């Protein structure tokens, strides 16, 4: 009889007879693999993986991984599926059930047991992993160990700010600053020293005047000075044009006030374009019909700076 005819004859048989023929009293890896249609080697490999918690070993660190293999992995070796299923079928409630129901309940119970064991391993491995992590970080951040193994400092802040709380509890300068005895009450330019757990010290330059050496700050300051100079030239040229055209100027300071009012919106633009805008406004002075010049004349009129009339002469 060929293999094809053998499989066809098996399909015509009832399921109960097939189970009795291939599973006999207990499900062994070879029988289950034959029943499911896998080869003996493939079925054995699948059942070996499913019947042990080694699936989760790849998600743990080396410490938890060794624990999984050394404690849980030998269970299917010393207590084979045959013995487990044999004892399971002897239970008062299970022994009165059919073979198919016993097999189904056994697989479900076995799966739930593996889940419980995996949960215990994950909890224990997570604790060991966090312990190692806290010890490693305590070498760089003082007080981070928080009372765990390898540390003798106070526990961390329960709010979750571990790095901030560890610095506050270990650095005495922090408490001096809170009392106003250190940087917050001292003059600018004081250098505070922060000592790490390794004993080395790092000078923290708290001089607020150091920003004056920043290239960007220097460039902004240089452009601001140029804008101020252009604005001064605008005031002088406006005064000169008004005098040439016969305007009456009660107070020369009103010219500066009027120009400040008119140029307010132009002073709010970016510093890189402000200087070019000021030069443009400077070139608009005295041009009849120019928007900026006409607005400046209207503002000057509010300060009683007008052309002299014949009665004034």
UniProtKB/Swiss-Prot annotation:
GO biological process: respiratory electron transport chain
One CC-aspect GO term: mitochondrial membrane
Keyword Transmembrane helix listed: yes
TM annotation in the entry: 41-61, 68-88, 102-122
Membrane topology: Multi-pass membrane protein
Keywords in alphabetical order: Membrane, Mitochondrion, Transmembrane, Transmembrane helix
UniProt-annotated location(s): Mitochondrion membrane
UniProt cross-references to InterPro entries, sorted A to Z: Di-haem_cyt_TM (IPR016174)
SUPFAM superfamilies: Transmembrane di-heme cytochromes
Misc. remarks from the entry: A stretch of 270 kb of the mitochondrial genome is duplicated within the centromere of chromosome 2 resulting in the duplication of the gene. The expression of this duplicated gene (At2g07718) is demonstrated.
Family of the protein in this entry: Belongs to the cytochrome b family.
Protein name in UniProt: Uncharacterized mitochondrial cytochrome b-like protein AtMg00590
UniProt organism field: Arabidopsis thaliana
């Amino acid at each position: 009889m060929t293999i094809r005819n053998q499989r066809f004859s098996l399909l015509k048989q009832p399921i109960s007879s097939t189970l009795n023929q291939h599973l006999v009293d207990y499900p062994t890896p070879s029988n289950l693999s034959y029943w499911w249609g896998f080869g003996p080697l493939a079925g054995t490999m699948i059942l070996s993986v499913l019947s042990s918690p080694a699936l989760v070993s790849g998600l743990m660190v080396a410490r938890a991984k060794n624990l999984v293999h050394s404690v849980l992995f030998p269970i299917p070796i010393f207590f084979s599926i045959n013995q487990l299923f044999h004892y399971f079928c002897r239970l008062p409630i299970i022994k009165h059930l059919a073979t198919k129901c016993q097999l189904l309940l056994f697989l479900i119970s076995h799966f739930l047991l593996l889940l419980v064991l995996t949960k215990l391993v994950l909890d224990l491995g997570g604790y060991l992993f966090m312990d190692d992590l806290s010890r490693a970080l305590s070498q760089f951040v003082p007080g981070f160990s928080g009372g765990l193994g390898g540390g003798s400092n106070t526990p961390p802040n329960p709010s979750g700010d571990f790095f901030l709380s560890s610095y506050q509890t270990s650095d005495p300068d922090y408490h001096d600053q809170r009392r106003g005895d250190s940087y917050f009450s001292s003059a600018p330019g004081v250098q505070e020293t922060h000592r790490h757990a390794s004993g080395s010290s790092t000078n923290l330059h708290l001089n607020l005047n150091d920003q004056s050496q920043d290239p960007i700050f220097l460039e902004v300051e240089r452009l601001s000075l140029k804008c101020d100079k252009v604005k001064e030239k605008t005031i002088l040229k406006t005064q000169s044009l008004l005098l040439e055209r016969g305007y009456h100027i009660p107070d020369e300071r009103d010219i500066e006030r009027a120009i400040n009012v008119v140029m307010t919106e132009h002073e709010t633009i970016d510093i890189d374009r402000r200087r070019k805008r000021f030069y443009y406004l400077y070139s608009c002075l005295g041009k009849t019909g120019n928007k900026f010049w006409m607005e400046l004349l209207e503002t000057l009129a509010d300060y009683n700076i007008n052309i002299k009339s014949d009665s004034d002469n």
